[in-house]
Amino acid sequence: MTTQPARQRTILRDISSRAWEHPADRGALVALRKLKGFDAVLKAVSGLFNERAVRLVFLGSAVRADEHQFPTLHRLLGEVAETLDAPDLPHLPELYVAANPVPGAQTLGINEPFIVLTSGLVDLLDDEELRFVVGHELGHAISGHAVYQTLLQRLIRLSGVTAFIPIGGLGVRAIVAALHEWSRKSELSADRAGLLATQDPATAFRVHMKLASGGRLEDLDTTAFLAQGREYLEAGDLRDSVLKLLLIENQTHPFAVVRAAELRRWVDSGEYTRILSGDRPSRSADDDATVSEAAREAARSYSETFAQSQDAVGRLAHDLAGFLGSAKGWLDETFRRRGA
């Protein structure tokens, strides 16, 4: 953890979490909530989860950041909360550093989420890169992701022990698969929150480069790394596309090169700049946002992704959608003429 010179950042007054939430994240959550038995599983697992006990585990085994311990992380949390104009939470999430050489971070909890960074991550990143990570995790907390992340972790640990859940093991596996899909999309949302917190795309890309390589920035190149991400997303035939789907089936996070490429795509779309300039969803208008709007945005997002994709499955989905749309138009016109 090293110190970088201070820089000015735009305070994002009244920003809604909708500003950084990836449409596919919201759409996956809408689909998840529609799954048969989801409410029963959520209720059952929530009853098994003792938030106080989990917090006590970290209180007893890790180090809580405050003015005296990891003061830089404590300061970063306060600054990130100010930048993201954190809404009226009861209090900021507690932040813990746990002894673990593997770089990682997570936000846990149901009613009072808290953040855990591993010592390996703190050692790997400089202060500005840690600002991105803290913003990423606070974004999870503000978006309400911690509830579903906690649910996924508990279900994974309970895999094979599902007789107590009314819908049975098969239904639970479907929910776990849907949670994995949502989790990967939620990471794209949180990356956007992290970028809005640091307001420096180069810093965000460096984090993913370090996570992929273990460090050694002198041997890395941002342009080449982003090109690598594009190659992974776009290259290959149908076999590679299927393999990529299988590779991430049980992953909670997209690969680092994919996350960097997706963040680059968001910056290039102009949306990031519009948010900084004031053209963004406001928290005060959240009550007017509807679930159907989230579903429509998700559908539009997937459609645009397929249209732009060079991946075999993406091209197939886009072409199939176009064919079905044309067929529907032809059938509609045929029936209209017959009825005339």
Residues covered by each model-derived region:
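Divalent metal-coordination and catalytic microenvironments
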Residues: L77, L117, H136, A190, ...
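Hydrophobic or amphipathic, alpha-helical segments that drive membrane association/targeting
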Residues: M1-N111, T273-A340
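Catalytic Zn2+-binding segment of zinc metalloproteases
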Residues: L138-R157
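Short pre-active-site segment immediately N-terminal to the catalytic Zn-binding motif
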Residues: D66-H68, V116-F132, A178-R184
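Short helix/loop segments within enzyme catalytic domains
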Residues: H68-H74, V80-D88, I167-E234
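Short hydrophobic membrane-inserting alpha-helices and related fusion/pore-forming segments
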Residues: I156-V172
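Extracytoplasmic and endomembrane cell-envelope/extracellular-matrix remodeling and assembly machinery
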Residues: M209-K244, E249, E262-A294
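Active-site His/Glu-centered metal-binding helix of metallohydrolases
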Residues: L125, V134-S143, S189, A193
